[in-house]
Regions:
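Catalytic domains of cell-wall/extracellular-matrix polysaccharide-remodeling enzymes
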Residues: 78, 113, 125-256
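Acidic/histidine-rich, surface-exposed loop or edge segments in extracytoplasmic proteins
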Residues: 60-67, 120-126
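Hydrophobic "anchor" residues on beta-strands that sit immediately upstream
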Residues: 64, 117, 208
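Acidic (Asp/Glu)-rich catalytic clusters
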Residues: 79-87, 102-121, 173-174, 198-201
Length: 264
């Protein structure tokens, strides 16, 4: 069946009249227009190359697991071990005060070395909408100083604690804001099995899933769900990679909750 599908794919491509319609000056996206059986459509050259040379990858559903409030000694380290075994990358939204704890420095260094994405969850885990603009900026600056002292300079996105964000916060922070499309509510005392079952039942292609790596049950449930969904054909990636795969530009001051097909 797979060989037949691949053959059909290339027959369709052979029938397509492909025309490069815009060169994309100054770093703009390059697009390809194509005609298949009389109909016209358009996709980026990046996406077209993916379909042409990696048709199986284009079909694969993707999910981004995200973990807030850490790191926590022992718990986050166990999670990193399990992710390494599976060659899975996730996104960690760290609290700056946690990063300043000596016992967490090596864990954060390992996150970066293992290829995980590191984002900001403020220094004190405060509700950003209650702060002045100067206080908001100080929270982010103090966080960045704590984390960059461990892993060096890097670009980052912010996840405001409690998901509380408004236009004023977005303008003040001037970085991408990452929220979520699936909330596991793992902080309510759920068991690992309950967390896993919820993720498995609710997760779909393009979702950004909210978890916390300060609870043993949460990281255990995440790994259980990970194994189940990988068997079903899902790939797990960082938030940045999820958005990039869908050709969704990551822009400062913009809020992202998921990455649906086509960037919707």
């Amino acid at each position: 069946m797979r060989h037949k599908a691949g053959l059909l794919f290339f027959i369709v491509l052979a029938a397509a009249a492909v025309i490069i319609c815009s060169g994309g000056l100054g770093g703009q996206q390059k697009y390809i227009s194509y005609s298949v059986l009389g109909g016209f459509s358009k996709m980026s050259q990046k996406s077209f190359s993916k379909v042409l040379f990696h048709p199986d990858l284009q079909q694969k559903p993707m999910i981004a697991l995200t973990f807030d409030d850490g790191p926590k000694a022992g718990v986050t380290d166990w999670l990193l071990d399990e992710l390494e075994k599976r060659n899975v990358k996730v996104t960690f939204f760290l609290i700056g005060s946690q990063a300043d704890l000596p016992e967490n420095r090596e864990t954060i260094r390992r996150m970066a070395e293992d290829g995980h994405q590191i984002g900001c969850h403020t220094y004190h885990h405060v509700q950003m909408t209650t702060l002045s603009e100067n206080q908001q900026k100080q929270e982010i600056l103090q966080w960045y100083q704590a984390v960059s002292s461990i892993i060096g300079d890097f670009s980052y996105a912010v996840r405001p604690p409690y998901g509380c964000v408004n236009n004023a916060v977005c303008r003040s922070l001037n970085v991408p804001v990452i929220l979520w499309s699936v909330d596991t509510e793992d902080w309510t005392g759920k068991s690992a099995g309950e967390i896993a079952d919820y993720v498995i039942s609710e997760a779909k292609d393009g979702d950004i899933i909210l978890l916390h790596d300060i609870f043993e049950e949460s990281v255990q449930g995440a790994v259980m769900a990970l194994d189940d969904l990988m068997r079903r054909g899902y790939t797990f990636v960082t938030v940045n990679d999820l958005l990039a795969d869908r050709d969704i530009a990551i822009q400062s001051g913009k809020v992202y909750r998921q990455a649906a097909q086509g960037g919707k």
